[in-house]
């Protein structure tokens, strides 16, 4: 846990018994937001939002249905959006690399276009005095930061450009399941001042609050 400001429960890829039971409300005590990095059943997300008492923000993974096929009730999509609520400014991109033609799979070129759209919205918000996101949320990792060499689990180079341009304190992703020796060393990587965390399963984190958030506490907006 980082000695910072806003307590967040981040989840991804694996349904965990500790979060899918009567003890969730006490386990998530003090959590101000839940962030899902994808590939979780909608009913699981709906359970977590109900019993944690915190808003849930999500992106879709390569095993999630396409956007037109529905969405988890009560949850807020981050895909290509910036959502600000209290001490959080969240930006997100759904999907993994294209490998089988399924939903939420993108080539590097396609993800670059999606990242450009998101980056333009971030810049527009910054010009309006709303500051940049303190958390980026994706399903796939950035290229070379916690990814693997196979086509499915290779990260996106477009994400590196987002890190270099916007310098978020924290980048959360899932997709790459953690197992085998050295798991702890593979969960957290970094690029510059950005800490990149693979939240596969779950992680409780404390997120740095952006300077502009203190003036808009309790508000919620999206671009």
What are these regions (language model features)?
Residues 15-19, 40-46, 62-69, 98-102, ...:
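Active-site environment of divalent metal-dependent phosphoester hydrolases
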Residues 51-52, 72-73, 192-194:
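Short, structured coil segments at secondary-structure junctions
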Residues 19-25, 42-46, 76-78, 120-124, ...:
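A generic local structural motif
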Residues 52-63, 156-159:
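A short, gly/pro- and small-residue-rich
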Residues 1-5, 22, 82-86, 162-165, ...:
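Binuclear metal-dependent phosphoesterase catalytic core
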Residues 10-12, 33-39, 57-62, 78, ...:
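Active-site neighborhood of phospho(di)ester-bond hydrolases with catalytic His/Asp-centered motifs
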Residues 1-51, 128-132:
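N-terminal active-site segment of His-dependent metallophosphoesterases
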Residues 10-18, 60-154:
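Conserved catalytic scaffold of divalent metal-dependent phosphoesterases
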